[in-house]
Amino acid sequence: MQPRRVNFHTLGCKLNFSESSTLAREFERGGFVRVAPTAEADICVINSCSVTEHADKKCRNLIRKLHRRNPAAIIAVTGCYAQLKPQEIAAIEGVDIVLSNNDKGALFKRVVELSGKGRAQVYSCETDSLTSFFAAFSSGDRTRAFLKVQDGCDYCCSYCTIHYARGSSRNMPVADLVAEARQIAAGGQKEIVLTGVNTGDFGRTTGERFIDLLRALNEVEGIERYRISSIEPNLLADEIIAFCAASPKFMHHFHIPLQSGSDRILGLMRRRYTTARFAERIAAVRRLMPDAFIGIDVIVGFPGETEADFRTTYDFLAGLEPAFLHIFPFSERPGTPAVDLPGKVPPSVATQRVAELEGLCERLHGAFCARAEGTEDTVLFESTRRDGMMFGFTGSYRRVKVPYDRSKVNAVCRVKLGAMDETHDLLGKILD
């Protein structure tokens, strides 16, 4: 008898990616064979996102596509869209089971208990019941793992549904996360990215601090690199900056959400800082790590954003000179306070503002990468092979390419960095 086949379709953030990887391992332990997302499968698992209306639509389209391709397959949907609108998903033809984020850890059990296709079974819960912590880390990538350290968010920004989809901030104990990091190291991966919904808010459950976690992980043998996936500016404390600057394991790489360079818009968004505070945090990073990679999230087209507000945002970002911008047009989410705000920005205007910031990002990222031409740095090489080249990243997240050498996959090498190409990759020469 052929083993049953399962595939996974992960939408959204790296937190979802870590959870999908953990669910896949459970299916494999249960005798299933994991197949590619494009392959025919007996069970299709979708880990959904709901950060924007586009994410919801993408999930609905994926369900329909999978059902057309595999009409007999069991389709299971979990994640943030499933948490927020379970009945909407259950009504889509082909869906067999919908699980809340609280029930995500029971997905394998629920799926194998299904007797066949029929009316979709829905396991839902209210936001107040989102109290469980589904421990997760990714595996499969030969070089980098994503370790879930925190879940939920207490911030309730006016445009965001994640608090409703993920519940209150909570975490695993430091000791348990250290044990998971050791398990990752035993699997041969060299780099861990710490991920969560509001990663820097770590410790709400256990009374520990994020800096306590960083210090403990720093002692794990076998892991050579850590990156913090994202951290709110008001949580990027001086002691965290100083620790990352001093530790050879924590990369000089920070992803810090701004959302707007207008203090008026930040107030409407219910963010917890001003532009002055944000700029001060960036300056604090650069005082100790002048060459740090700083990525910034920004939303354009928020209700009430005037042309003057956008120009203020543009000029603020240009003055900060980050390495990269993650730019999002505002997406109205039902049930959020932003829905009722006046001054809706036409989509065409938001699209134009996105394009302007993308042009700024292209210039800033190119300038950041070009500054490394002619220098030496360490690079962790990945298994990707394209046009005879292999690729890896420096600690400050510049991508480097060298002629493919299988022996260098998952190795940290000293590299001389040469000229930058049109995609901002740096041509490297391995020195050791």
For the regions a protein language model found, what residue spans apply to each?
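Proteins enriched for Cys/Gly/acidic motifs involved in redox and nucleic-acid/cofactor modification
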Residues: 1-201, 239, 254, 276-287, ...
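A structural micro-motif
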Residues: 32-33, 73, 96, 223-224, ...
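Residue-level signal for inorganic ion chemistry
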Residues: 45, 80, 107, 194, ...
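Short, solvent-exposed loop/turn segments at secondary-structure boundaries
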Residues: 55-57, 168-173, 203-208, 268-271, ...
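Conserved SAM/AdoMet-binding glycine-rich loop
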Residues: 75-76, 84-85, 186-307
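Glycine-enriched alpha-helix->loop->beta-strand junction motifs that scaffold or abut catalytic
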Residues: 94, 245-252, 320-323
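Terminal RNA-binding accessory module
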Residues: 340-432
